[in-house]
Amino acid sequence: MAVVLRGGITGGFLHHRRDASSVITRRISSVKAAGGGINPTVAVERATWLPGLNPPPYLDGNLAGDYGFDPLGLGEDPESLKWYVQAELVHSRFAMLGVAGILFTDLLRTTGIRNLPVWYEAGAVKFDFASTKTLIVVQFLLMGFAETKRYMDFVSPGSQAKEGSFFFGLEAALEGLEPGYPGGPLLNPLGLAKDVQNAHDWKLKEIKNGRLAMMAMLGFFVQASVTHTGPIDNLVEHLSNPWHKTIIQTLFTSTS
């Protein structure tokens, strides 16, 4: 996942925990030199994923969630860095939707409210209103259109909000100022990030939750492969015997 490589790992590994507004603090003191000139001294304090780490120069802290984590140097090329930023953002959003959907449907299934399949078997369900082939074709068309428009906005920022960009008259509702954040009343109905001062805070919250969701999805994959049950089932089993029903014992049991 390019996501983790670009931005870093949040949580307990951070050197300093701060709000986005104080991720980078600059203190400039001016001292008069003997000749009457001004000698500025700049001290820059960065939150990093590892104490004492010197972040690479291309990760200067301006990106949301940038804690200087790029051991492979994938973002050294500016154009590649732009692409990885968008890749992380999209994967984060899909992961957040996926985690929420899995937990919600699993809760309905385990409580008996709805007769639903466990999440990793949902793709095998047959629907009466359409065949599997029809659903695949429809998904290709809809997702293909959306992803094509997103890529075009990445190549030419703001182009999809212009009149005549073939968006069924919704161009005015896509007034975002940068790729990945189309904004407007369609995708930002509450206007949460219209305030420039708070926009970075919302971006940081989104990327932190997105990274957490991607780790959760990875956990769901491993969980399903090892236990062949859903996350709610595993949680209930763990709570029934917290000292003996843990991830470590489960992994050792499955390998023995």
UniProtKB/Swiss-Prot annotation:
Top-level taxon: Eukaryota
Sequence positions that bind chlorophyll b 2: 93
UniProt transit peptide range: 1-32
Topology in the lipid bilayer: Multi-pass membrane protein
Sites where the protein binds chlorophyll a 3: 206
Residues binding chlorophyll b 1, per UniProt: 49
Positions annotated to bind chlorophyll b 4: 150
Null allele phenotype: Slightly lower NDH activity in immature leaves. Smaller version of the NAD(P)H dehydrogenase-photosystem I supercomplex (NDH-PSI) supercomplex. In the double mutant lhca5 lhca6, drastic reduction of NDH subunits accumulation upon increased light intensity.
Residue spans crossing the bilayer: 94-113, 129-146, 212-232
Function comment: The light-harvesting complex (LHC) functions as a light receptor, it captures and delivers excitation energy to photosystems with which it is closely associated. Seems involved in the function of the photosystem I in low light conditions, when other LHCA proteins are less abundant. Required, together with LHCA6, for the formation of a full-size NAD(P)H dehydrogenase-photosystem I supercomplex (NDH-PSI) that triggers cyclic and chlororespiratory electron transport in chloroplast thylakoids, especially under stress conditions (e.g. increased light intensity).
Assembly notes: The LHC complex consists of chlorophyll a-b binding proteins. Homodimer. Heterodimer with LHCA2 and, possibly, LHCA3. Can substitute to LHCA4 to form a complex with LHCA1. Binds pigments. Element of the NAD(P)H dehydrogenase-photosystem I supercomplex (NDH-PSI).
The record's note on its domains: The N-terminus of the protein extends into the stroma where it is involved with adhesion of granal membranes and post-translational modifications; both are believed to mediate the distribution of excitation energy between photosystems I and II.
Name this protein carries in UniProt: Photosystem I chlorophyll a/b-binding protein 5, chloroplastic
